[in-house]
Amino acid sequence: MESFSSKSLALQAEKKLLSKMVGRSAAHLFIDETSSEVLDELYRVSKEYTHSRPQAQRVIKDLIKVAVKVAVLHRSGCFGPSELALATRFRQKLRQGAMTALSFGEVDFTFEAAVLAGLLTECRDVLLELVENHLTPKSHGRIRHVFDHFSDPGLLTALYGPDFTQHLGKICDGLRKLLEEGKL
């Protein structure tokens, strides 16, 4: 059985970041049960696609680190008005990407890797612009790593292919729930 857990990794990252910050509102951060399940499925897809456990772990770790850092910045009020507009745009693009991924998963023969890859690339670019003055170049590299990995047309084609049907179903279930709850 796989011992990797995105939830425990997220909690470790939260603790590390929060140990350097003050304020209780920062304590309620990123990961809930549904998000954890989606991240775990993304990990499994990455591991099967790349045939590399360390590479799959690295991309999910990078995703969690970036998400926690952006959440901390947002909750700490570090974003100015123009950056809050970028944050709204990022959330809209991410939501659009999730709805597109769901649509491709639910309606046969509609999948187009270029469309989903394009949406993920747009998300990456908006997020990089948002955190440009707040995070280090190392964090910018993590953002590029995560979005470049998941916008890879080969990975997307495999995900929507017959070998990954079970993973895609679980990811779509999680995305649907996150959208319904307004968390995406």
Curated annotation (Swiss-Prot):
PANTHER family named among the record's database cross-references: TUMOR NECROSIS FACTOR ALPHA-INDUCED PROTEIN 8-LIKE PROTEIN 2 (PTHR12757:SF4), TUMOR NECROSIS FACTOR INDUCED PROTEIN (PTHR12757)
Intracellular or extracellular location(s): Cytoplasm; Nucleus; Lysosome
GO biological process, one term: negative regulation of inflammatory response
Designated gene of the protein: TNFAIP8L2
Family to which this protein belongs: Belongs to the TNFAIP8 family. TNFAIP8L2 subfamily.
Function: Acts as a negative regulator of innate and adaptive immunity by maintaining immune homeostasis. Plays a regulatory role in the Toll-like signaling pathway by determining the strength of LPS-induced signaling and gene expression. Inhibits TCR-mediated T-cell activation and negatively regulate T-cell function to prevent hyperresponsiveness. Also inhibits autolysosome formation via negatively modulating MTOR activation by interacting with RAC1 and promoting the disassociation of the RAC1-MTOR complex.
GO CC annotation, single: lysosome
DNA-binding recorded as keyword: no
Record keywords: Cytoplasm, Immunity, Innate immunity, Lysosome, Nucleus, Phosphoprotein, Ubl conjugation
InterPro entries xref list: TNFAIP8-like (IPR008477), TNFAIP8_sf (IPR038355)
Assembly: May interact with CASP8; however, such result is unclear since could not reproduce the interaction with CASP8. Interacts with RAC1.
PTM summary: Phosphorylated by TAK1/MAP3K7; this phosphorylation triggers association with BTRC and subsequent ubiquitination and degradation. Ubiquitinated in a BTRC-depdent manner; leading to degradation mediated through the proteasome pathway.
Designated name of the protein: Tumor necrosis factor alpha-induced protein 8-like protein 2
Record-linked Pfam families: DUF758
Domain remarks in the Swiss-Prot or TrEMBL record: The central region was initially thought to constitute a DED (death effector) domain. However, 3D-structure data reveal a previously uncharacterized fold that is different from the predicted fold of a DED (death effector) domain. It consists of a large, hydrophobic central cavity that is poised for cofactor binding.
Sequence positions bearing Phosphoserine: 3
